[in-house]
Structures are given as structure tokens and as C-alpha cells.
């Protein structure tokens, strides 16, 4: 078998191949034959000059083949490798990565003898390849490649029995298998990066064009273009070198760690750790000068607990409490996603730890006992590094579309070149060299030299704008996706609502409908549960943890001490000592503690009302009605319960089975919390709704609470229906929040129902939909998803994508990881202050001259506006003694510094640092607000329209150039060297200025066209080209009437004449008009007048045309090789140019009105996908 499907997030497919011997390669032997034929047959039979042309063509073709082996991995495999069916015959493999994970690569296949633990079993052969710092192993049993396995899916019982690597043989085997715990990335050099850039297809093509222009005597233009190319490529290489050097500085901490090997504790460097090692990890005591200790690898906490700062991975500064697996069911398998509160992730810092000396294996330094799970690039930090590392390549917008569009233009260029070739060969006196040169120039004119640079700038400008707003992106290709988003999904808690919870009181203990706020009237047992059933912890003498739990403690007026003891601030109540915690788990929807009050042991439990209900001995009569009443009001409700435990030892309490602790409970009331909606949630979501986006809420909260909040933030506006099970049966029905409207559930009527109602479903309903294969029929029409588990959030996003929705998911980056990764655009919000106020933002967009670049602060600081713009023109006191010239020099130095730093180069993406990015999501926003969603969508739309206008302008310039270089070239019309240089500079300046247009502050209801291939763009191109062609043809024909009847030789050197002059002037005006007409300003970007540099460049271009056409400065026209125009011809040119502009402008505006961008018709795709699924089920 020559091909293997790998699946997964990194590699999709692997093809086996074998390298051919040098003489049998397709880039060697065919050309050896061709060169021999040229030497023995062609040279003797034709003129030497024609033979040299043939040799030049053959050499160019050979060089092109060699270059294609660098550009295309598929072509390289075809030329230099042969396919093999057996893995034993292969020595390399072609790796096809998963979509959006980079480009294909050919990597060597390694065969080696694998060491085994037992000498008697002999050595086994291991076959593997390394791809992007990951190893893939071939399994002969399965006949497939899979990722190198790490011990991450064993049972808790297995980990608790771990004693590390017991022998030197096992250590050697593990070292050979997994390697050292390092981030090994070779240091690149400037020369290597520059060589890579110079081997890019666009760059080679541009250098080839420069060579052709030199042969056609365009020396100034060629040298200018070549200088510009090398300047930009060297800037790019320098910027990438800095980025990669910064990434290489990230190292696994080389601190020493106590490791249990061969039956004893030994001190080893963190870089020597291996998966399976048992280690002692903790923060050194302050007496020994200990600092925050960095965790060197991903490890599972066996014994002891730790408080960890995970900001380097999640960007979230709130410390996380890590607990041991002691007390968990021994047969339960580890899932790092689900059991992350037991896992210490590499790169994070231990703030404090609590050892447990009751375990059989004692740590020598008082640390926590842990077992290493993953090392090196397989750790969470390593994965994030890989994401950042392999997204530092050059980024472009719509690369496949740009290729197809250029191919479309090449067709026209080839037709024009063919016309010139046929006509030229009819004249036997024509120089074949000049003829072939002319044809080559026509075909190469399709792609201007600045195109790749401008496409990169389109994305990178957006990246920089987002970074200045505190939004970091690790996957730049997703920015254009943001412009295509039509569905925005939001988590509720901590995203739409504030983290500052308000404790409203306790309900459900009396017949009173309002929650009891007087804590003296609340049973002491209920207060004890609220005071102790939590996961709060002291870090550096400060209480940290869930804001809801802190609000409850404050609301009941109890205190909590560092020794895990809770006691009332007033009165003589008993203290509550926590003995064992069972932390909150999203799949269980509850948490519990075992406490001791005086000499009595009790279990305190809190969780979702419907979850606790199933575990109560007696359910109060008004239980359901009470919690539903509070949730309808938008409150968050937690059910409280307890049970008495028999007398026991402390060790027995800690070993109790969680399920036994959390069963047969006695109800103790409902804790009711108000969850205030963030001030800007409703305005931001209303703006999104008004800008043609559908809104969806996905939350783990209760359905009634979710629907109440959804109504306040404009997600639902129609009457709401909630899908639920009817009574104890298995039938489902739609019920309104007040239970006055009830409609039987039928999956076939969902679409009709969704037209008049907003639908809400819960996690249990999703399980039903999965069981009945109705997911695709129902989920696309739902507005609110409540009580959903993290895995269900992922399923919801996958379903929306399957029916053709452009999805954005906004969450907090902890419970929403799967959904954030699945969405086209995932935005993780971190709780930091906003970097800019709305007023600052609007000022920023109004005036570029008054705005200075925002400095990037460390992750812990707020990003503030700074620089010249904030001083409002006043000279700082320390600079008042400087002269005007010195001040000017300082300003110039500051500008140069800005250009030279790592963010001043719009050509390269800004470096995303660890701590800025979240491993949860492609976009990380350091805001306690959903406002970044609008910023990301604005930048996405801006990138889309900028790319679209670039291609339109490119298309029109290409079609006009193809005509000028073909039909007019045959008539002897040419451009001078200076003329071509000025034209090139003008085009580059225009492209640069349009790519830096900033998006408008307000999102428009109008949508950008998602693709280059649309009716609007095609009609716009054809219509404008027809007008341009008419203007060009009539102008040249008019000029010919004033020309003396002289024969102009097409191959003759350039000399000024009237037709050449008119041709240049018309080309200049067409260029200015093309940029002015096709600039996409409102409603997405700044208008032409607001984009000052572009506006002034247009005025300068139009003014330049008027000046040279009016012949105001004769010396200027002489230097440009332009002859004087007759008065009548001059007036006609100016009138025709004005008419051409008005007609093109009107045509463009008419098409924008007639063919606006629209949301894709996802319902058609939903029906098609559902019908296809039905067919598969029948088969």
C-alpha cells in the first residue's frame, strides 16, 4: 500500500516514495538528451543567433523544472522520486498536512532497531518519520502511521502504582523513544532565510521579468524594480529572523528536579525528564531563596495539591488549583481535557504547594508527587509553540483564489501574445529575438512585482491593528474568515455576563417567593455549606478563586482561613474544617466536600438543581417550580445539599468514593446569584445583529436563565420555546418559559417553527438528537443552547459548519476549548481592562496624523494610548530647550525606530508571544468585554474588500497592458524607460496606500463579497475594460491623424512621437481612474477622502496627467520624452478622460447597488446535507 490515511489535526495523509538515482531523475536525463540534440542537430542547421535563442529557451525551461521541484512538493515527488507499494522499499514519504495546517513536505523515512526492556526478546525494527517536531510511528499490525504514543490514557490506578523507570535499560529505551525534554529548533541565519525568500515563485518570476525588461532596454525601470524587490525581501528575512530567534529563546527550564529512578531519588535537570518518570514537584521554600518554579513537562499530580499560574498557556492570570488523583476511581481512565484539574502543564509556574505525607512513596524535598505524561514539543506549551512557530511563514489572503484569478488573466495574455506571434511571423524581416521577447513581456505583464507584497500587507495590516487593540492571533489565515462570518456564538457566564457575581440570597426553604436575604433567618447548615463547599484558596495571603464562591462567602458574612477552616464573622457559630474536596467537574455539574464540625463528619454538595434533584432522598414539593422561578428572572441558581457521615479516620474520609459521598442527600436550599450583564454586551450584540449576523448562545447554565439573558442581549426577539422531555416518558415537547404554550416535538417541522419562534435546547435534548440522527435537522435552527457539556459545544459548532455557516465562537478559553478550535474564528476572552475607550477608538480612526502607535505592554499591563498623538502638539518639558531642527531630528529618529522594530514592517506578521496567545483559541483578546468580536470582524471585512479591489485593479491593468503590448506594439507604439519607471512607482504607491486603509468604526448591514469569483466582479471588469479600450483606441487613432505618414518599425528603438505621447498619457489616466473607481471605501473602509495618503496620491496622479497634457512645463515633458500636443487633441483628451472616469464610476456604483454581498443560502445546503445523510442511512 503506497498511501496511508493518518487523520487527526496535524497529518491527513502519507504517501510512500523512494529517491531515484541522479541519472534517472526527470530533471537530468531528458535534458541531457535535449542538450545533445541541440549541439548535434540544431547548431549545424540554423543561424548561430537563432541557435542561441533556442539554447536560451531550453536553459530557461530546465531552470524552471528545477525551480518547480522547490516550489511544488508534488512535482518534486514526480521528478525525483518513484512511488512504492511496500514500506520496506521506501526511504522517504510525502506528508499531506490537515487543512490549514501548512503545506506538504517530503521527509525521510527512518528505520532503526528498537531497544526493548528484555534482552531475550531481541531488537525490533522501528519505522518512523518526523514532521514539524512530531514523530509518527508505523504499526505493522495496523498497517498505518500514528502519532508517537505517550502514557496519557491509562487508568488512575495504573498511575498510582507507577514507580518510575526501574532499570538503566528502561531509561535507555524511553530516551530513545521520546528523546530529551527540549524545544530543539535550529538557529536560522539571515543568508538561509534570504535564500528561501529569493526562491519564492513570485520573486523568481519578478527577477525573470526584470531580465526581460533589461533586454528590451528598460534599464532605469529594471534597476529600480530589482532594488525594491531586494529591499523588501531582506526586510522580510530580517523580521522573520528576529521572530524565530525570540522563539528559540523559549527553553524548558534547566532547573533540577528530584526524580525517582531505579528505586531511589536522584537529582536531574528538567531537560532529562522522560514520560513515565515519577518526580517531586513544588515551590522551594522562601528560606532557601526559592522562586516560582516552572513545571518542566506535562505531569499528572498523584499526591499533594498545588496552586499554579497558567498565564503562559491560557493568558488567564487567575491561579488554578490542581488536585491529586488520590480518591478517584482506580478504573477511570485519564482524559487530559476532562481531568485538567489533576494535570500540571509544562511552562506554568507553581505559586504554592501542599504535600501529602500519607502516601507510601515519600518525596525527599517535601514536594508533590507527580508522574510525567508528555515532554518536549508534545507538552501543552510545546503545542502552542508549534502553532506560533509554523504560522510565522509569509501570510496572504485567498491564495488559491489569487492563483485561479491570475490563471484567468494569463489566458487573455496568451491570446494577445499568440496574436503578436502570428502577425510577427508574417513579416520575414522581423527579428525573431525581438518578437519572442515581446511575446514573453506580454505574458509576464499579468503579475505586477508588488502583488505578493501587497497581499501580505492586506493581512498583516489587520494583524497589527488587532495587536494594538490587545487582540493576538496565532493563525493569520483566519482573518479573512472573519469577514465571511455570518453566525456569532457566545458563551454566557464570564463572556456576556460579568464575573462580578452578586449573592441574592437563599431560596426554597419557605413558601416566600423571594430569596431570603437576612442570613440570621437562614438555617446554619445552609450557611455552613455556602462557607465551605468551594474551591477558594489563599495565594500570597490573598483569597483567589471563582467570583461566585467569593460572592457567597461575602454575602453570608463568613470568613475562610488559610488552614481550610470556615467560621462566622459574628456570633458563636461552629467552625467548619474541610477534610477532602471533590472539585467541580463540568460533566458531573457538581462539587462536594467532606467537612468536620466539632467531632461530626458531613458531606456538603452543591451543583445544578436538576443534577442534585436526582441525588436527594426527599425532593420538596415546590423544588422544580422554585428554581425555575429564579432562573426565569435571569438568576444563577445552585442547589445545596448535605448528608451525615459515620465516624471515621481522616485517612478514611480522604479515601471515600465520590459517588458515595454525593448520594442520599438532604436538601438545604437554593443559593441564588445575580449575574449582571456586562455594560457593552447588549450594544455589541445589537451591532452584530444589525450588520447581518445571526446570534447564538451556547452555555452550561440553566435553560430559563439562558433564555432570559438571551432576550436582554438581542439574541432572541421572538417567543421562546424550550425542548424538554414530557414527564417521565421519552417523548419530547416544546414548552414556553412560562409553560403556557406547549407544542409536540417533530423534527420535520423545525424549520417552520423556527420562523415564528426562537428555539432553545439543552444538553439532554442534544443526546436525544444524536440518538435519533436528527442533529443536522434541528441544531442549525436553534438560538439558545443550555446545560451543554464542552464536547457538545464542539458538536454544535461542527454542525453549523457542516451546513455552510461561517462561524465565530467567543468564550473564556477554559471550558470552551473544543468549540473555539472548531469555529472558523475562535475568540478567547481574558479578564483584563479594555485598552482603548470607544472615544479613543473613534479619534484613532478619524485622524491618522494625530494617532501614534500604541506600545505593547506585558501581559499583566493595560495597553494605553501613548506617543505624540496624546500630547496634542505640546512639546514635553524635557524637550523645550531643543531647537526646531533637533526636534525634527528626534521625530525622524523615532519614525526610523518604529520602522525597524518588529512591528513596524507591515510585510511580516507581528510576533505573538507566549502569554499573549491562548492555547485554546486562534484569537486571544485581553478584554473583559465582547467588543473585540466587532474589531476582528471589521478587520476581516477590511482584508476581504482590500484583496478584492486589488484583484479588480490588477485585472483591469492586465487587460489594458495586454492590448498595449500586443496590438499597439505591432503598430510601433512603445513606452520610454523613464515613463515606465514613473508608471511603476505610481502603481506601487497606489497599492501601498489602499492596503493601509483602516476599517470604519461601525459595522455595516451590507456584507462584502466573499469570493473573487462573483457576477459583480466579472461584470465590473468587462464593463470598465470596454470603456478603457474605447478611450485608448480612439485616443491613439486621433493622434495618428496628426502624425506625418511615416513608417514606424515595431523593433526600432524608442523615439518620442505623438502616438507614443498620447498612449503614455492615456495609460497614466487609466491607471489613476482604475484605482479611484475601484477603491472600496464605505461601508467597510475609510472613504477616499478619509484615506489621506491615497487621496493625495490620486490628486497628484490626476494633476500630473493634467500638467503633462496641458504642456505647462516643457522641460518636464522633454525629460519624459513627450512631444507637444496639438490644441484640439489636448482638449479632446481631457474631455474623453473625464467622460471615461464618469462612465466607469457610474457603472461600478450601479453594480454595487445591483449585486450587494449576501449571506450564503445555508438552508439549501442544510437540506442537501440532511438528504444525503438520509440516503446513507437507507443504504
Curated annotation (Swiss-Prot):
Cytoplasmic side: 1-20, 72-192, 239-402, 454-947, 998-1013, 1080-1092, 1149-1179
Ranges for region Disordered: 833-880
A cellular component term, taken from the record's GO annotations: plastid
Annotated signal peptide: none
Keyword list, A-Z: ATP-binding, Endoplasmic reticulum, Magnesium, Manganese, Membrane, Metal-binding, Nucleotide-binding, Translocase, Transmembrane, Transmembrane helix, Transport
Active site as annotated: 491 (4-aspartylphosphate intermediate)
Keyword Cell membrane: no
Expressed in which tissues: Highly expressed in root meristem. Expressed in pavement cells of trichomes, stipules, stamens and pollen grains.
Entry superkingdom: Eukaryota
Protein task: Mediates manganese transport into the endoplasmic reticulum. The ATPase activity is required for cellular manganese homeostasis. Plays an important role in pollen and root development through its impact on protein secretion and transport processes. Functions together with LPR1 and LPR2 in a common pathway that adjusts root meristem activity to phosphate availability. Under phosphate limitation, restricts SHR movement in root meristem and is required for maintaining SCR expression in the root meristem stem-cell niche as well as for proximal meristem activity.
This protein's name: Probable manganese-transporting ATPase PDR2
Organism: Arabidopsis thaliana
Gene: PDR2
Amino acid at each position: 500500500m503506497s498511501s496511508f490515511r493518518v487523520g487527526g489535526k496535524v497529518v491527513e495523509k502519507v504517501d510512500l516514495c523512494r529517491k531515484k538515482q541522479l541519472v534517472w531523475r526527470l530533471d537530468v536525463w531528458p535534458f541531457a538528451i535535449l542538450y545533445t540534440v541541440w549541439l548535434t542537430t540544431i547548431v549545424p542547421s540554423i543561424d548561430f543567433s537563432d541557435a542561441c535563442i533556442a539554447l536560451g529557451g531550453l536553459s530557461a525551461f530546465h531552470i524552471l523544472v528545477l525551480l518547480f521541484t522547490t516550489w511544488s512538493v508534488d512535482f518534486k515527488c514526480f521528478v525525483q522520486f518513484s512511488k512504492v507499494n511496500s514500506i520496506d522499499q521506501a526511504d522517504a514519504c510525502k506528508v499531506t498536512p490537515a487543512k490549514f495546517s501548512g503545506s506538504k513536505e517530503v521527509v525521510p523515512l527512518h528505520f532503526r532497531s528498537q531497544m526493548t526492556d528484555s534482552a531475550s526478546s531481541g531488537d525490533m525494527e522501528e519505522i518512523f518519520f518526523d514532521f514539524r517536531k512530531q514523530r509518527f510511528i508505523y504499526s505493522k499490525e495496523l498497517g498505518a502511521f500514528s502519532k508517537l504514543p505517550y502514557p496519557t490514557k491509562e487508568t488512575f490506578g495504573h498511575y498510582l502504582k507507577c514507580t518510575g523507570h526501574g532499570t538503566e535499560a528502561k531509561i535507555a529505551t524511553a530516551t530513545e523513544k521520546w528523546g530529551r525534554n527540549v524545544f530543539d529548533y535550529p538557529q536560522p541565519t539571515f543568508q538561509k532565510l534570504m535564500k528561501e525568500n529569493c526562491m519564492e515563485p513570485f520573486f523568481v518570476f519578478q527577477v525573470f521579468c526584470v531580465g526581460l525588461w533589461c533586454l528590451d532596454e528598460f534599464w532605469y525601470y529594471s534597476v529600480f524594480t530589482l532594488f525594491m524587490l531586494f529591499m523588501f525581501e531582506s526586510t522580510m528575512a530580517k523580521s522573520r529572523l528576529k521572530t524565530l530567534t525570540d522563539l528559540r529563546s523559549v527553553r524548558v527550564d534547566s532547573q533540577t528536579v528530584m526524580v525517582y529512578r531505579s528505586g531511589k531519588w536522584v537529582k536531574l535537570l528538567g531537560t532529562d525528564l522522560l514520560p513515565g518518570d515519577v518526580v517531586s514537584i513544588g515551590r522551594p521554600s522562601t528560606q532557601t531563596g526559592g522562586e516560582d518554579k516552572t513545571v518542566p513537562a506535562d505531569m499528572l499530580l498523584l499526591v499533594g495539591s498545588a496552586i499554579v499560574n497558567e498565564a503562559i498557556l491560557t493568558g488567564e492570570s487567575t491561579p488554578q488549583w490542581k488536585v491529586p488523583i488520590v480518591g478517584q476511581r482506580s478504573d477511570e481512565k485519564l482524559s487530559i481535557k476532562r481531568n485538567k484539574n489533576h494535570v500540571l502543564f509544562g511552562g506554568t509556574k507553581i505559586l504554592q504547594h501542599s504535600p501529602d505525607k500519607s502516601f507510601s512513596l515519600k518525596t525527599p524535598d517535601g514536594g508533590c508527587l507527580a508522574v510525567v505524561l508528555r515532554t518536549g514539543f508534545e507538552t501543552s506549551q510545546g503545542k502552542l509553540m508549534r502553532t506560533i512557530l509554523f504560522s510565522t511563514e509569509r501570510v496572504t489572503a485567498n491564495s488559491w483564489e489569487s492563483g485561479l484569478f491570475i490563471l484567468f488573466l494569463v489566458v487573455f495574455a496568451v491570446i494577445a501574445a499568440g496574436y503578436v506571434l502570428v502577425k510577427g511571423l508574417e513579416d520575414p524581416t522581423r527579428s525573431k529575438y525581438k518578437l519572442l521577447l515581446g511575446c514573453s513581456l506580454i505574458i509576464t505583464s499579468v503579475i505586477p512585482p508588488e502583488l505578493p507584497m501587497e497581499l501580505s500587507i492586506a493581512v498583516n495590516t489587520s494583524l497589527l491593528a488587532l495587536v494594538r487593540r490587545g487582540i493576538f492571533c496565532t493563525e493569520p489565515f483566519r482573518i479573512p474568515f472573519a469577514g465571511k462570518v455570518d453566525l456569532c456564538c457566545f458563551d454566557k457566564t464570564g463572556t456576556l455576563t460579568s464575573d462580578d457575581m452578586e449573592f441574592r440570597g437563599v431560596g426554597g426553604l419557605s413558601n416566600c417567593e423571594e430569596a431570603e436575604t437576612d442570613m440570621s433567618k437562614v438555617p446554619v447548615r445552609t450557611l455552613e455549606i455556602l462557607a465551605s463547599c468551594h474551591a477558594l484558596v489563599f495565594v500570597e495571603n490573598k483569597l483567589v478563586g471563582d467570583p461566585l464562591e467569593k460572592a457567597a462567602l461575602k454575602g453570608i458574612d463568613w470568613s475562610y482561613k488559610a488552614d481550610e477552616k470556615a467560621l462566622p464573622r459574628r456570633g458563636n457559630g461552629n467552625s467548619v474544617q474541610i477534610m477532602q474536596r471533590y472539585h467541580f467537574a463540568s460533566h458531573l455539574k457538581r462539587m462536594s466536600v467532606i467537612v468536620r464540625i466539632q467531632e461530626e463528619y458531613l458531606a456538603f454538595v452543591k451543583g445544578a438543581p436538576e443534577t442534585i434533584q436526582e441525588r436527594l432522598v426527599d425532593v420538596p414539593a415546590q423544588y422544580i417550580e422554585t428554581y425555575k422561578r429564579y432562573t426565569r428572572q435571569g438568576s444563577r441558581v445552585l442547589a445545596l445539599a448535605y448528608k451525615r457521615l459515620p465516624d471515621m479516620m481522616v485517612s478514611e474520609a480522604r479515601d471515600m468514593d465520590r459517588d458515595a459521598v454525593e448520594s442520599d442527600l438532604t436538601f438545604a436550599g437554593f443559593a441564588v446569584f445575580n449575574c449582571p450583564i456586562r455594560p457593552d454586551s447588549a450594544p455589541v450584540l445589537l451591532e452584530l445583529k444589525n450588520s447581518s449576523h445571526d446570534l447564538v448562545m451556547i452555555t452550561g447554565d440553566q435553560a430559563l436563565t439562558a433564555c432570559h439573558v438571551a432576550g436582554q442581549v438581542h439574541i432572541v426577539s421572538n417567543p421562546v420555546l424550550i425542548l424538554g422531555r414530557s414527564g417521565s416518558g421519552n417523548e419530547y415537547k416544546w414548552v414556553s418559559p412560562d409553560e403556557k404554550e406547549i407544542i409536540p416535538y417533530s423534527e420535520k417541522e423545525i424549520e417552520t417553527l423556527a420562523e415564528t419562534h426562537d428555539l432553545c435546547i439543552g444538553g439532554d435534548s442534544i443526546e436525544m438528537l444524536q440518538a435519533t440522527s436528527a442533529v443536522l435537522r434541528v441544531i442549525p435552527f436553534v438560538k439558545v443552547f443550555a446545560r451543554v457539556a464542552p464536547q457538545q459545544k464542539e458538536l454544535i459548532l461542527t454542525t453549523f459548519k457542516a451546513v455552510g455557516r461561517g462561524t465565530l465562537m467567543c468564550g473564556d478559553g477554559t471550558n470552551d476549548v473544543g468549540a473555539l478550535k472548531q469555529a472558523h474564528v475562535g475568540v478567547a476572552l481574558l479578564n483584563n481592562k479594555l485598552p482603548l475607550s470607544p472615544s479613543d477608538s473613534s479619534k484613532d480612526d478619524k485622524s491618522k496624523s494625530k494617532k501614534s502607535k500604541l506600545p505593547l505592554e506585558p501581559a499583566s499591563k493595560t495597553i494605553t494610548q501613548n506617543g505624540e498623538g496624546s500630547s496634542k502638539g505640546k512639546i514635553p518639558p524635557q524637550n523645550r530647550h531643543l531647537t526646531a531642527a533637533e526636534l525634527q531630528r528626534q521625530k525622524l529618529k523615532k519614525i526610523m525606530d518604529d520602522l525597524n522594530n518588529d512591528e513596524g514592517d507591515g510585510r511580516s506578521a507581528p510576533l505573538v508571544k507566549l502569554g499573549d496567545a491562548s492555547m485554546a483559541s486562534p484569537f486571544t483578546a485581553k478584554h473583559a468585554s465582547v467588543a473585540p468580536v466587532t474589531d476582528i470582524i471589521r478587520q476581516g471585512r477590511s482584508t476581504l474588500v482590500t484583496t478584492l479591489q486589488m484583484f479588480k485593479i490588477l485585472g483591469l491593468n492586465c487587460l489594458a497592458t495586454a492590448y498595449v503590448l500586443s496590438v499597439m506594439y505591432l503598430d510601433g507604439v512603445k513606452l520610454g524607460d523613464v515613463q515606465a519607471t514613473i508608471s511603476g512607482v505610481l502603481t506601487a504607491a497606489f497599492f501601498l496606500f489602499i492596503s493601509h486603509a483602516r476599517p470604519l468604526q461601525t459595522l455595516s448591514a451590507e456584507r462584502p463579497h466573499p469570493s473573487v469569483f462573483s457576477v459583480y466582479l466579472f461584470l465590473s471588469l468587462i464593463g470598465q475594460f470596454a470603456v478603457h479600450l474605447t478611450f485608448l483606441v480612439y485616443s491613439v487613432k486621433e493622434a495618428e491623424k496628426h502624425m506625418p505618414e511615416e513608417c514606424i518599425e515595431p523593433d526600432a528603438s524608442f523615439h518620442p512621437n505623438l502616438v507614443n505621447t498620447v498612449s503614455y498619457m492615456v495609460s497614466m489616466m487609466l491607471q489613476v481612474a482604475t484605482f479611484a473607481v475601484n477603491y472600496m471605501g464605505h461601508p467597510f473602509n475609510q472613504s477616499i477622502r478619509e484615506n489621506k495618503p491615497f487621496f493625495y496620491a490620486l490628486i497628484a496622479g490626476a494633476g500630473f496627467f493634467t500638467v503633462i497634457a496641458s504642456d505647462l512645463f516643457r522641460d518636464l515633458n522633454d525629460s519624459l520624452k513627450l512631444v507637444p500636443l496639438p490644441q484640439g487633441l489636448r482638449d479632446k483628451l481631457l474631455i474623453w478622460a473625464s467622460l471615461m472616469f464618469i462612465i466607469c464610476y457610474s457603472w461600478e456604483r450601479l453594480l454595487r447597488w445591483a449585486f450587494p454581498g449576501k449571506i450564503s443560502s445555508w438552508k439549501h445546503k442544510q437540506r442537501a446535507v440532511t438528504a444525503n445523510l438520509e440516503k446513507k442511512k437507507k443504504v
